[in-house]
Protein backbone atom coordinates (compact mmCIF):
# COMPACT_ATOMS: atom_id res chain seq x y z
CA UNK A 1 0.00 0.00 0.00
CA UNK A 2 2.80 2.39 0.97
CA UNK A 3 4.76 1.47 -2.17
CA UNK A 4 1.70 2.21 -4.30
CA UNK A 5 1.38 5.64 -2.69
CA UNK A 6 5.05 6.41 -3.33
CA UNK A 7 4.76 5.29 -6.97
CA UNK A 8 1.77 7.64 -7.43
CA UNK A 9 4.04 10.61 -6.66
CA UNK A 10 5.94 9.96 -9.89
CA UNK A 11 2.89 9.39 -12.10
CA UNK A 12 1.66 11.86 -14.72
CA UNK A 13 -1.61 12.14 -12.77
CA UNK A 14 0.12 13.80 -9.81
CA UNK A 15 2.71 15.68 -11.86
CA UNK A 16 -0.21 17.18 -13.82
CA UNK A 17 -1.64 18.47 -10.57
CA UNK A 18 1.60 20.30 -9.78
CA UNK A 19 1.96 21.61 -13.34
CA UNK A 20 -1.45 23.29 -13.28
CA UNK A 21 -1.44 24.24 -9.59
CA UNK A 22 1.75 26.30 -9.34
CA UNK A 23 0.90 28.69 -12.22
CA UNK A 24 -2.66 29.12 -10.94
CA UNK A 25 -1.36 29.97 -7.47
CA UNK A 26 1.14 32.49 -8.84
CA UNK A 27 -1.51 34.13 -11.04
CA UNK A 28 -4.00 34.31 -8.17
CA UNK A 29 -1.29 35.81 -5.96
CA UNK A 30 -0.45 38.37 -8.66
CA UNK A 31 -4.06 39.59 -8.62
CA UNK A 32 -4.01 39.73 -4.80
CA UNK A 33 -6.77 37.15 -4.40
CA UNK A 34 -7.12 36.18 -0.71
CA UNK A 35 -5.61 32.79 0.07
CA UNK A 36 -4.26 32.71 -3.48
CA UNK A 37 -2.13 29.60 -2.99
CA UNK A 38 -5.24 27.68 -1.94
CA UNK A 39 -8.00 29.09 -4.13
CA UNK A 40 -5.99 29.14 -7.37
CA UNK A 41 -5.06 25.43 -7.30
CA UNK A 42 -8.48 24.44 -5.93
CA UNK A 43 -10.40 26.12 -8.74
CA UNK A 44 -8.06 24.97 -11.52
CA UNK A 45 -7.91 21.34 -10.37
CA UNK A 46 -11.69 21.27 -9.87
CA UNK A 47 -12.21 22.43 -13.45
CA UNK A 48 -9.57 20.00 -14.72
CA UNK A 49 -11.15 17.07 -12.87
CA UNK A 50 -14.66 17.86 -14.11
CA UNK A 51 -13.25 18.27 -17.63
CA UNK A 52 -12.01 14.70 -17.56
CA UNK A 53 -8.30 15.24 -16.88
CA UNK A 54 -6.88 12.27 -14.99
CA UNK A 55 -5.44 13.73 -11.80
CA UNK A 56 -4.73 12.33 -8.36
CA UNK A 57 -3.53 13.47 -4.96
CA UNK A 58 -1.46 10.67 -3.36
CA UNK A 59 -2.49 10.08 0.23
CA UNK A 60 1.14 10.03 1.35
CA UNK A 61 1.68 13.58 0.01
CA UNK A 62 -1.45 14.87 1.70
CA UNK A 63 -0.46 13.12 4.93
CA UNK A 64 2.98 14.77 4.85
CA UNK A 65 1.40 18.19 4.34
CA UNK A 66 -1.02 17.64 7.22
CA UNK A 67 1.90 16.80 9.52
CA UNK A 68 3.65 20.01 8.44
CA UNK A 69 0.41 21.86 9.10
CA UNK A 70 0.21 20.28 12.55
CA UNK A 71 3.77 21.41 13.34
CA UNK A 72 2.87 24.94 12.29
CA UNK A 73 -0.17 25.01 14.57
CA UNK A 74 1.90 23.41 17.32
CA UNK A 75 3.83 26.69 17.67
CA UNK A 76 0.64 28.25 19.04
CA UNK A 77 0.40 25.74 21.89
CA UNK A 78 1.68 26.94 25.25
CA UNK A 79 0.68 26.89 28.91
CA UNK A 80 -1.63 29.86 28.36
CA UNK A 81 -3.68 27.75 25.96
CA UNK A 82 -4.37 25.19 28.68
CA UNK A 83 -5.35 27.99 31.05
CA UNK A 84 -8.20 28.70 28.62
CA UNK A 85 -9.66 25.19 28.89
CA UNK A 86 -12.61 26.47 30.95
CA UNK A 87 -13.64 28.55 27.93
CA UNK A 88 -13.63 25.41 25.78
CA UNK A 89 -16.48 23.99 27.87
CA UNK A 90 -18.76 26.79 26.72
CA UNK A 91 -17.68 26.77 23.09
CA UNK A 92 -17.95 22.97 22.98
CA UNK A 93 -21.49 23.14 24.39
CA UNK A 94 -22.45 25.80 21.85
CA UNK A 95 -20.83 23.70 19.10
CA UNK A 96 -22.87 20.65 20.12
CA UNK A 97 -26.12 22.62 20.04
CA UNK A 98 -25.10 24.17 16.71
CA UNK A 99 -24.41 20.76 15.13
CA UNK A 100 -27.72 19.32 16.32
CA UNK A 101 -29.71 22.29 15.00
CA UNK A 102 -27.81 22.19 11.68
CA UNK A 103 -28.58 18.52 11.14
CA UNK A 104 -32.25 18.90 12.07
CA UNK A 105 -32.86 21.96 9.86
CA UNK A 106 -30.74 21.11 6.81
CA UNK A 107 -31.65 17.41 6.78
CA UNK A 108 -35.34 18.31 6.77
CA UNK A 109 -34.75 20.73 3.88
CA UNK A 110 -32.88 18.12 1.83
CA UNK A 111 -35.58 15.53 2.47
CA UNK A 112 -38.41 17.84 1.47
CA UNK A 113 -36.95 19.75 -1.46
CA UNK A 114 -34.07 17.58 -2.76
CA UNK A 115 -35.72 14.18 -2.25
CA UNK A 116 -32.83 12.90 -0.13
CA UNK A 117 -33.49 9.82 1.96
CA UNK A 118 -33.26 10.23 5.72
CA UNK A 119 -29.75 8.85 6.26
CA UNK A 120 -28.29 10.61 3.21
CA UNK A 121 -29.83 13.90 4.33
CA UNK A 122 -28.37 13.57 7.84
CA UNK A 123 -24.82 12.89 6.63
CA UNK A 124 -25.12 15.61 3.98
CA UNK A 125 -26.34 18.12 6.57
CA UNK A 126 -23.69 17.43 9.21
CA UNK A 127 -21.18 20.34 9.33
CA UNK A 128 -18.09 18.16 9.61
CA UNK A 129 -15.15 16.92 7.58
CA UNK A 130 -15.93 14.87 4.48
CA UNK A 131 -13.66 11.91 5.25
CA UNK A 132 -15.15 10.73 8.57
CA UNK A 133 -18.71 11.42 7.36
CA UNK A 134 -18.12 9.34 4.22
CA UNK A 135 -16.90 6.44 6.36
CA UNK A 136 -20.00 6.66 8.56
CA UNK A 137 -22.26 7.00 5.52
CA UNK A 138 -20.68 3.94 3.90
CA UNK A 139 -21.22 1.90 7.07
CA UNK A 140 -24.89 2.89 7.02
CA UNK A 141 -25.24 1.91 3.33
CA UNK A 142 -26.13 5.47 2.37
CA UNK A 143 -25.99 7.09 -1.08
CA UNK A 144 -22.31 8.14 -1.04
CA UNK A 145 -22.64 10.18 -4.22
CA UNK A 146 -25.20 12.53 -2.68
CA UNK A 147 -23.21 12.92 0.53
CA UNK A 148 -19.88 13.50 -1.24
CA UNK A 149 -21.28 15.94 -3.79
CA UNK A 150 -23.09 17.98 -1.14
CA UNK A 151 -19.97 18.31 0.99
CA UNK A 152 -17.65 19.05 -1.93
CA UNK A 153 -19.85 21.86 -3.22
CA UNK A 154 -20.16 23.20 0.33
CA UNK A 155 -16.39 23.07 0.80
CA UNK A 156 -15.81 24.96 -2.45
CA UNK A 157 -18.26 27.68 -1.39
CA UNK A 158 -16.94 27.98 2.17
CA UNK A 159 -13.26 28.03 1.25
CA UNK A 160 -13.89 30.55 -1.53
CA UNK A 161 -16.00 32.96 0.53
CA UNK A 162 -14.28 32.90 3.95
CA UNK A 163 -10.92 34.37 2.80
CA UNK A 164 -12.71 37.40 1.34
CA UNK A 165 -14.62 37.89 4.61
CA UNK A 166 -11.42 37.66 6.64
CA UNK A 167 -9.32 39.88 4.39
CA UNK A 168 -11.99 42.59 4.44
CA UNK A 169 -12.16 42.59 8.23
CA UNK A 170 -8.51 42.38 9.19
CA UNK A 171 -5.21 43.79 8.04
CA UNK A 172 -3.37 40.56 8.75
CA UNK A 173 -1.95 38.27 6.14
CA UNK A 174 0.53 35.44 6.19
CA UNK A 175 3.15 36.69 8.59
CA UNK A 176 6.74 36.47 7.44
CA UNK A 177 9.31 36.99 10.16
CA UNK A 178 12.45 37.95 8.30
CA UNK A 179 14.39 38.51 11.55
CA UNK A 180 14.01 34.94 12.77
CA UNK A 181 17.00 32.71 12.07
CA UNK A 182 15.60 29.34 11.09
CA UNK A 183 19.03 27.83 10.45
CA UNK A 184 20.20 28.73 13.97
CA UNK A 185 17.63 26.40 15.53
CA UNK A 186 18.46 22.99 16.96
CA UNK A 187 17.40 20.80 14.05
CA UNK A 188 17.43 17.73 16.28
CA UNK A 189 14.24 19.17 17.78
CA UNK A 190 12.53 18.86 14.40
CA UNK A 191 13.50 15.18 14.20
CA UNK A 192 12.16 14.60 17.72
CA UNK A 193 8.91 16.36 16.85
CA UNK A 194 8.44 14.28 13.70
CA UNK A 195 9.15 11.00 15.52
CA UNK A 196 6.77 11.93 18.36
CA UNK A 197 4.15 13.04 15.84
CA UNK A 198 4.30 9.75 13.93
CA UNK A 199 3.99 7.82 17.20
CA UNK A 200 0.91 9.73 18.38
CA UNK A 201 -0.64 9.66 14.90
CA UNK A 202 -0.37 5.86 15.02
CA UNK A 203 -1.85 5.73 18.54
CA UNK A 204 -4.66 8.18 17.76
CA UNK A 205 -5.52 6.31 14.58
CA UNK A 206 -5.70 3.01 16.47
CA UNK A 207 -8.07 4.43 19.10
CA UNK A 208 -10.06 6.17 16.36
CA UNK A 209 -9.54 9.78 17.40
CA UNK A 210 -10.84 12.04 14.57
CA UNK A 211 -8.31 13.71 12.25
CA UNK A 212 -5.45 11.63 13.70
CA UNK A 213 -2.87 13.17 11.36
CA UNK A 214 -3.54 16.66 12.70
CA UNK A 215 -4.54 15.85 16.29
CA UNK A 216 -1.60 13.47 16.76
CA UNK A 217 0.90 16.05 15.53
CA UNK A 218 -0.71 18.78 17.65
CA UNK A 219 -0.56 16.60 20.76
CA UNK A 220 3.09 15.74 20.14
CA UNK A 221 4.02 19.38 19.46
CA UNK A 222 2.16 20.63 22.52
CA UNK A 223 3.59 17.95 24.81
CA UNK A 224 7.20 18.46 23.76
CA UNK A 225 6.93 22.24 23.72
CA UNK A 226 5.22 22.66 27.11
CA UNK A 227 7.67 20.25 28.76
CA UNK A 228 10.57 22.15 27.14
CA UNK A 229 11.83 18.98 25.49
CA UNK A 230 11.68 20.28 21.93
CA UNK A 231 10.28 23.14 19.89
CA UNK A 232 10.86 24.12 16.30
CA UNK A 233 9.58 26.90 14.07
CA UNK A 234 9.16 26.05 10.40
CA UNK A 235 9.64 28.80 7.80
CA UNK A 236 6.36 30.67 7.31
CA UNK A 237 6.78 30.35 3.54
CA UNK A 238 6.04 26.63 3.81
CA UNK A 239 2.43 27.60 4.52
CA UNK A 240 2.08 28.43 0.82
CA UNK A 241 3.04 24.89 -0.18
CA UNK A 242 0.58 23.49 2.37
CA UNK A 243 -2.09 25.72 0.87
CA UNK A 244 -1.29 24.56 -2.65
CA UNK A 245 -1.48 20.85 -1.82
CA UNK A 246 -4.65 21.21 0.26
CA UNK A 247 -6.31 23.30 -2.43
CA UNK A 248 -5.36 20.81 -5.11
CA UNK A 249 -6.60 17.91 -2.98
CA UNK A 250 -10.05 19.52 -2.80
CA UNK A 251 -10.15 19.83 -6.58
CA UNK A 252 -8.95 16.24 -7.07
CA UNK A 253 -11.99 15.00 -5.15
CA UNK A 254 -14.09 15.90 -8.19
CA UNK A 255 -12.17 13.37 -10.31
CA UNK A 256 -14.98 10.81 -10.16
CA UNK A 257 -17.81 13.33 -10.47
CA UNK A 258 -19.64 14.48 -13.59
CA UNK A 259 -20.79 17.99 -14.45
CA UNK A 260 -24.39 16.73 -14.54
CA UNK A 261 -24.06 15.23 -11.07
CA UNK A 262 -22.67 18.48 -9.70
CA UNK A 263 -25.31 20.59 -11.45
CA UNK A 264 -28.17 18.49 -10.08
CA UNK A 265 -26.98 19.02 -6.52
CA UNK A 266 -25.67 22.59 -6.80
CA UNK A 267 -28.83 24.57 -6.02
CA UNK A 268 -29.78 22.55 -2.96
CA UNK A 269 -26.16 22.48 -1.77
CA UNK A 270 -25.96 26.27 -2.03
CA UNK A 271 -29.18 26.67 -0.02
CA UNK A 272 -28.00 24.12 2.56
CA UNK A 273 -24.61 25.85 2.83
CA UNK A 274 -26.30 29.23 3.29
CA UNK A 275 -28.39 27.83 6.15
CA UNK A 276 -25.29 26.31 7.77
CA UNK A 277 -23.31 29.54 7.45
CA UNK A 278 -26.12 31.64 8.95
CA UNK A 279 -26.46 29.22 11.86
CA UNK A 280 -22.67 29.27 12.25
CA UNK A 281 -22.63 33.08 12.41
CA UNK A 282 -25.36 33.01 15.06
CA UNK A 283 -23.41 30.42 17.06
CA UNK A 284 -20.21 32.48 16.77
CA UNK A 285 -22.06 35.58 17.98
CA UNK A 286 -23.53 33.69 20.95
CA UNK A 287 -20.05 32.40 21.80
CA UNK A 288 -18.74 35.97 22.15
CA UNK A 289 -20.80 36.28 25.35
CA UNK A 290 -18.88 33.39 26.92
CA UNK A 291 -15.31 33.65 25.62
CA UNK A 292 -12.92 36.49 24.87
CA UNK A 293 -11.90 35.41 21.39
CA UNK A 294 -11.56 37.22 18.08
CA UNK A 295 -14.95 37.05 16.29
CA UNK A 296 -13.21 35.96 13.07
CA UNK A 297 -11.63 33.05 14.92
CA UNK A 298 -15.06 32.05 16.23
CA UNK A 299 -16.56 32.31 12.74
CA UNK A 300 -13.88 29.94 11.47
CA UNK A 301 -14.52 27.61 14.42
CA UNK A 302 -18.21 27.34 13.53
CA UNK A 303 -17.59 27.21 9.80
CA UNK A 304 -19.11 24.06 8.21
CA UNK A 305 -15.90 23.13 6.42
CA UNK A 306 -13.18 20.53 6.86
CA UNK A 307 -10.86 20.86 9.86
CA UNK A 308 -7.69 20.87 7.73
CA UNK A 309 -8.90 23.54 5.31
CA UNK A 310 -10.23 25.79 8.07
CA UNK A 311 -7.06 25.37 10.15
CA UNK A 312 -4.82 26.38 7.27
CA UNK A 313 -6.96 29.49 6.69
CA UNK A 314 -6.45 30.40 10.35
CA UNK A 315 -2.68 30.06 9.95
CA UNK A 316 -2.61 32.01 6.68
CA UNK A 317 -4.40 34.97 8.25
CA UNK A 318 -2.63 34.73 11.62
CA UNK A 319 -5.80 33.78 13.50
CA UNK A 320 -5.72 31.42 16.49
CA UNK A 321 -6.03 27.95 14.86
CA UNK A 322 -6.55 26.11 18.16
Language-model features, listed with the residues they occupy:
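Cytoplasmic-side transmembrane-helix entry/capping segments in multi-pass membrane proteins
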Residues: 58-70, 89-91, 115-126, 148-153, ...
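Short, hydrophobic transmembrane alpha-helix segments
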Residues: 23-33, 50-56
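Alpha-helical membrane segments and immediately flanking helix-loop junctions
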Residues: 113-153, 294-322
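Core mid-bundle transmembrane helix pairs that form the ion/substrate translocation pathway
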Residues: 18, 22, 27, 160, ...
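Structural signature of hydrophobic alpha-helical transmembrane segments
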Residues: 27-43, 62-65, 88-99, 120-125, ...
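Hydrophobic transmembrane alpha-helices of secondary-active transporters
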Residues: 42-87, 220-227, 236-264
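Entry/N-cap segments of selected transmembrane alpha helices
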Residues: 13-20, 77-108, 190, 240-241, ...
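Membrane-embedded alpha-helical segments of transport systems
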Residues: 129-132, 148-169, 279
Amino acid sequence: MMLKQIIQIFTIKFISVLIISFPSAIIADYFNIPLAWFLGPMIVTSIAALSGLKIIMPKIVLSFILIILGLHIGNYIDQNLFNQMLDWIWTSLIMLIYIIICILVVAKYLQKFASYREKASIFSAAPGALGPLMILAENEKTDLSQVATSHLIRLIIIITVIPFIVVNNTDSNVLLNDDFSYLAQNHLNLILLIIASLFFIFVFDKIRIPAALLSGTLFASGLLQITDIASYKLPDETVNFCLLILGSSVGCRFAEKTVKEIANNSLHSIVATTILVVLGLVAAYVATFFVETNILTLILSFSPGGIYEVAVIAIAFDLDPD
